Swiss-Prot record:
Organism the protein comes from: Rattus norvegicus (Rat)
InterPro entries in UniProt: Aldolase_TIM (IPR013785), HMGL (IPR043594), PYR_CT (IPR000891)
Name used for this protein in its record: 3-hydroxy-3-methylglutaryl-CoA lyase, cytoplasmic
Family label: Belongs to the HMG-CoA lyase family.
Primary residence: cytoplasm
UniProt subcellular location: Cytoplasm, Cytosol; Endoplasmic reticulum membrane
Alphabetized GO MF terms: hydroxymethylglutaryl-CoA lyase activity; metal ion binding
Pathway, per record: Metabolic intermediate metabolism; (S)-3-hydroxy-3-methylglutaryl-CoA degradation; acetoacetate from (S)-3-hydroxy-3-methylglutaryl-CoA: step 1/1
GO cellular component terms, semicolon-separated: cytosol; endoplasmic reticulum; endoplasmic reticulum membrane; membrane; perinuclear region of cytoplasm
Primary role: Non-mitochondrial 3-hydroxy-3-methylglutaryl-CoA lyase that catalyzes a cation-dependent cleavage of (S)-3-hydroxy-3-methylglutaryl-CoA into acetyl-CoA and acetoacetate, a key step in ketogenesis, the products of which support energy production in nonhepatic animal tissues.
Membrane-protein topology: Peripheral membrane protein
Tissue expression profile of the protein: Present at high level in duodenum and small intestine (at protein level).
EC assignment: 4.1.3.4
Length: 343
């Protein structure tokens, strides 16, 4: 073939590249690769915790009910990828979210692997009681920085929701159950448009003061940009340390990874994502899924940031659930990798 141009060599070595450190995040023993050295110099976190929300946030908007055994197998596959947190279901009324009607069966059916946490979403005290009865040992509550979204999503005002959450969090803490808090519409609302950073800060501070160990700031509509992410985080971080914050980005406008990078540069090291980019929001028409876990891991691996997660195994779990629900993956990494395998 003679002397090949550099670009051609890269094409020929594409499969090999995918098998190397961008897949696993591993570097040569005893040495930092250039990406890891750069991450340390730039002040980026050395470790990023990924909170996998695919089984709950990813599937809850699916119109066709996913069989319980499929959900259980999906979660069991994710549990073997190195992920340390997998949000498995939601103890909400089946009238509001039919997809989550089998929450107790899912909770009782999964194999809970050592070192993996399995939080569930609860809307109120009744949901907490049902979750605990089903074996849940960690929960999350779901608030909003938008009055309109709060009323559409949980059928009450922000102030009313805070009253509910205070009861839930207090009760959970008495049972030594950790509580995570979500704040949706942190960068925009489908009904109100732009949301003032101060409003996000107020809601986040209240949840944190009640006892939530971590506040996940959600770009529910996926309209955020690195600029708006930076402005919002600067406001919230005046009241809550970055170590108690996470970001939850939807990719409607293709900004999720850029927004996540901005958050990492500001000291946040917890990121929510969903395998295959599953998700959406029934109360935010047009919003696409969460940032794909595969794409997030690929980016973090390429930056030399440790996640402890096996990209190949995550892709296999994504392939499983996409086939089960008859969907095409939204992960760019999965699309490119599967295509390369066929060539």
């Amino acid at each position: 073939m003679g002397n090949l141009p550099s670009a051609a060599k890269h094409c020929l070595n594409y499969q090999q590249l995918l098998r190397e450190h961008l897949w696993s995040g591993e570097s040569v023993a005893g040495a930092l690769d250039p990406a890891q050295e750069a991450s340390q110099l730039s002040g980026l976190p050395e470790y990023v915790k990924i909170v996998e929300v695919g089984p709950r946030d990813g599937l809850q908007n699916e119109k066709v009910i996913v069989p319980t055994d499929i959900k259980i197998e999906f979660i069991n596959q994710l549990s073997q990828t190195g992920l340390s947190v997998i949000e498995v279901t939601s103890f909400v009324s089946s009238r509001w979210v039919p997809q989550m009607a089998d929450h107790a069966e899912v909770m009782g059916g999964i194999h809970q692997y050592p070192g993996v946490r399995y939080p569930v979403l609860v809307p109120n005290l009744q949901g907490l009681q049902h979750a605990v009865a089903a074996g849940a040992t960690e929960i999350a509550v779901f608030g909003a920085a938008s009055e309109s979204f709060s009323k559409k999503n949980i059928n009450c005002s922000i102030e009313e929701s805070m009253g509910r959450f205070e009861q839930v969090i207090s009760s959970a803490r008495h049972m030594n159950i950790p509580v995570r808090g979500y704040v949706s519409c942190a960068l925009g609302c489908p009904y109100e448009g732009s949301i003032m950073p101060q409003k996000v800060t107020e809601v986040s501070k209240r949840l944190y003061s009640m006892g939530c160990y971590e506040i996940s700031l959600g770009d529910t509509v996926g309209v955020g940009t690195p600029g708006s992410m930076k402005t919002m985080l600067e406001s919230v971080m005046k009241e809550i340390p970055p170590g108690a914050l996470a970001v939850h980005c939807h990719d409607t406008y293709g900004q999720a990874l850029a927004n996540i990078l901005t958050a990492l540069q500001m000291g946040i090291n917890v990121v929510d994502s969903a395998v295959s980019g599953l998700g959406g929001c029934p109360y935010a028409k047009g919003a696409s899924g969460n940032v794909a876990t595969e794409d997030l891991i690929y980016m973090l691996n390429g930056m030399g940031l440790n996640t402890g997660v096996d990209l190949h195994k995550v892709m296999e779990a994504g392939d499983f659930i996409c086939k089960a629900v008859n969907k095409t993956t939204n992960s760019k990494v999965a699309q490119a990798s599967f295509k390369a395998r066929l060539e």
